[in-house]
């Protein structure tokens, strides 16, 4: 689970302008942080199937947002996947 401070730091790092919380970049960055946290949780709790389902839903949502961003602006997409260190 992300704390308010962690979430705020991620939003400030990836926002396009002041007060931007809904751009694809911010949404993907927040989902990536949540996915990383949940992945660590699942390494310890291998039989937590409910959380695994939530993880798969988050990965799917991130994939859709990345596909949208790639379609709209390929340069922003490439910049984002490089900054996050994820495969595109």
Curated annotation (Swiss-Prot):
Pfam family, one: Ribosomal_S15
Statement: the UniProt record of this protein carries the keyword Ribonucleoprotein: yes
Gene3D superfamilies the UniProt entry points to: 6.10.250.3130, S15/NS1, RNA-binding (1.10.287.10)
Molecular function GO terms recorded: rRNA binding; structural constituent of ribosome
GO terms classed as biological process: translation
GO cellular component, one term: cytosolic small ribosomal subunit
First and last residue of the signal peptide: none
Keywords carried by this UniProt record: Ribonucleoprotein, Ribosomal protein, RNA-binding, rRNA-binding
Family: Belongs to the universal ribosomal protein uS15 family.
Function: One of the primary rRNA binding proteins, it binds directly to 16S rRNA where it helps nucleate assembly of the platform of the 30S subunit by binding and bridging several RNA helices of the 16S rRNA. Forms an intersubunit bridge (bridge B4) with the 23S rRNA of the 50S subunit in the ribosome.
Subunit (UniProt): Part of the 30S ribosomal subunit. Forms a bridge to the 50S subunit in the 70S ribosome, contacting the 23S rRNA.
Protein name: Small ribosomal subunit protein uS15
Species of the source: Halothermothrix orenii (strain H 168 / OCM 544 / DSM 9562)
Gene name of the encoded protein: rpsO
């Amino acid at each position: 689970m992300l704390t308010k401070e962690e979430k705020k730091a991620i939003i400030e790092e990836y926002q396009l302008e002041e007060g931007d919380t809904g751009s694809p970049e911010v949404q993907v960055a927040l989902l990536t942080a949540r996915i990383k946290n949940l992945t660590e949780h699942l390494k310890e709790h291998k039989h937590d199937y409910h959380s695994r389902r939530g993880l798969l839903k988050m990965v799917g949502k991130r994939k859709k947002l990345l596909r949208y961003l790639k379609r709209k602006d390929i340069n922003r997409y490439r910049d984002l996947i490089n900054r996050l260190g994820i495969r595109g």
